[in-house]
Amino acid sequence: MNMKEISKVVDLVRESNPLVHNITNVVVTNFTANGLLALGASPVMAYAKEEVAEMANIAGALVLNMGTLRPEEVEAMLLAGKSANVNNVPVLFDPVGAGATSYRTEVARHIPAEIDLAIIRGNAAEIANVINEKWEIKGVDAGTGNGNVVSIARQAADELNTVAVITGKEDVVTDGERTVLIRNGHPILTKVTGTGCLLTSVIGAFVAVEKDYVKAVVAALTFYGVAAELAAVKTVEKGPGSFQIEFLNQLANTTSADIEKYGKIEELE
């Protein structure tokens, strides 16, 4: 997997304008939609149980995010996910805050048990808690703790039969056999709410157009990280408000040439 291959997926997303169905949380809906539009994808936010199965059927990818968790949204996620499975639409799951409460953890484990996932993405604590591995968590944004992140990612990929993505200072992508590290991004991303949730939806746009899911995720993470770096160069001294706006600009303006120039990936043995 080389940077030229990775960069081509960015162009493919913009050429294809994939429809990404998001059942996401109320905190990030606007930011997620604008980020996908800036990238060149088409977002739809459909939550009603009466329509989610039909909407998932016509989407290029389905993103399930449990940030603001309510029983009616869990029901909608299950309906949409099962419809997506029947119609070969890739399902992405973001188990926000898994491990923070017993209810949240129960849902985070129930969804992969009921739905075949193409991708699961979270921080190390979230992914560890989904597969019932011990990892301390404090709040929905906790990602630090003790443990081997690559090992946890590989275990999750094997147990859930999916591509596991753990994001943090370094991002880990694995299907249990191929494992890739991505070293792009900027710390200011953690000062803007919803950047992780948007990332999962951006990955959705990439897997909608590239069926090699490891390659698709690596391309999405590299693109996202490079866009953040370019935005930070212009705005980091001004603060997170300016960064958020410039980041949307860079999601629109970051090119495949930028990916080839600034992308930092490493394939592990």
From Swiss-Prot:
Keywords for this protein: ATP-binding, Kinase, Magnesium, Metal-binding, Nucleotide-binding, Thiamine biosynthesis, Transferase
The enzyme's E.C. designation: 2.7.1.50
Protein residues bound to substrate: M45, G194
Cofactors, names only: Mg(2+)
InterPro entries: Hyethyz_kinase (IPR000417), Ribokinase-like (IPR029056)
Pfam families: HK
Gene Ontology molecular function: any one: ATP binding
Catalytic activity reported: 5-(2-hydroxyethyl)-4-methylthiazole + ATP = 4-methyl-5-(2-phosphooxyethyl)-thiazole + ADP + H(+)
Single biological process term from Gene Ontology: thiamine diphosphate biosynthetic process
Pathway assigned to this chain's UniProt record: Cofactor biosynthesis; thiamine diphosphate biosynthesis; 4-methyl-5-(2-phosphoethyl)-thiazole from 5-(2-hydroxyethyl)-4-methylthiazole: step 1/1
Function: Catalyzes the phosphorylation of the hydroxyl group of 4-methyl-5-beta-hydroxyethylthiazole (THZ).
Protein name per Swiss-Prot or TrEMBL: Hydroxyethylthiazole kinase
Organism: Bacillus cereus (strain G9842)
Gene: thiM
